[in-house]
Amino acid sequence: MNKGKITVSDIVSAEKILGIEYSKQEREQMMNDLEDQIISAKTRRKSKFDNNVPTASKFDPRLPGFEMSNLTGLKISEKTYKCPSSDEDIAFASVAAQGHWIKTKQITSRRLTEIYLDRINKFQGQLNCYANVTVELALAEADAMDLLTEDYISLGPLHGIPYGLKDLFDTKDIETAWGAEPYKNRLPLKDAEIVKRLRAAGAVLLGKTAVGALAYNDIWYGGRTKNPWNLNEGSSGSSAGSASATAGGLCSFAIGTETLGSITSPSERCGTTGLRPTFGRVSRSGCMALCWSLDKIGPICRSVEDTGLILSIINGYDENDRFSIKAPFNFNSAKATDDLKVGYIPDAFGADATELDKDILRIVSNLGLDLQAVALDNLPYSSLINILHAEAAASFEDLTLSNEDDNLTWQDNEAWPNSFRKARFLSAVDHVQLDRLRYLVMKAMDDLFNDIDILIGPFDVGPMLVASNFSGHPCLHLRVGFESLPTRTRIKSEKIDPKKKFKVPRGLSIWGALFEEEKILNFGLALEAQLNIADQRPTFAR
């Protein structure tokens, strides 16, 4: 037998991996032709693609007949805030309040920036939430905003507001390593589109927040990012540093990304308010691509209103993002919620839900809203995750084929290196069939929101986390209470004392129809006011 020749036994082994079975005659018939397929694949692999090269196929969450609203505008509360004397109170204040203080000259952008830089210096060792702190740049940008303020010039609600940026976004001449060892010392030549938009709005860059390596989990080349409410556990990810820094009062707000839970999961863990916009609403130009048909960008804040304010700045079409969609954004924080139809899936509040989850239904009923039990079509939603694995493995094919993935810190079974390797055995035929299943999921989600305005539920119970990410629907996640839980971990070697418990946040996810973020924001505002717990802070910061 010639070395390298495909044999019948090779095909039999492959059948086991793919979960299929051929006859002896079928195996013999395909044996020689398989070698041509292998040669073709190897030839293609000689072509190396930069991470910013997109796919030819283009995901669009809109089904035929979709009508885009043409409403646009931003109206937030016009409260007058008095600047407190405590640096901690200033640090944990909302973006809206801080913006008012700067505009009315109760505080300078430089002073606000210095407060955060001091807190980063004090608490970074505990939280490990920043990959890179841009001290000189932050102070220079703050001083520039103060000069404008002195001349009564304001660039808008983010004028002089310091923020953290997930280390997936290119920043000119500032290391952007994607949390991964192979990309350390990577210096982009230009800024990502979102950086340009935030700078034009007057926001001040404090630094690059830590990201789980290649946008997964909370483990990166600098260690593990921690949850401010329990420093023994990770912050979850992959927007690990963005959620941790925001929850810990180490920035006014932060920018995160989500492919499958990377805004909502750390927001759940750290008690922040995270907004995952509709797919295509926010430009990803200059952001690391993990999954072209799934990646989304959104704000992580300490209040609902702030997320809407920031989305109004970063929203907008960008011709440099092949998947970008022209979509106006309208947000009036004073808009009434009386006519909202709120849906819930009963099974999501069943045996796997916490008592706090179930109590939320009573609280929503007390708001006087139309609460309806609904059902999502019975489809194999979890199967869609193989689309994510295939796209992610394609994004970082070179790491797998060169064995550089061995240099990544996290090497457990569920970590990227193993997932990338396994993905090489996914069937292209199954991948196409998954794309067809995805279309059915899009239709199921569209049908769901024909009858309701918003859907509520625990983010980690039921099919909605997967279904909504693959359909492109928006989600707001906010804190609704606290639980007493032992330390949570995904590290198999880590030993945990199950008897030692900590007060940690519990959140709720609020999903909406495509491009209708205003409805979930207004509902979130009403719920936030009813619960009155948004101002509670982690004890480590006192």
Language model: regions and residue ranges:
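Mature N-terminal segment immediately following signal peptide/propeptide cleavage
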Residues: 7-26
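Gly/Ser-rich catalytic/binding loops embedded in alpha/beta enzyme cores
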Residues: 22-260, 362-363
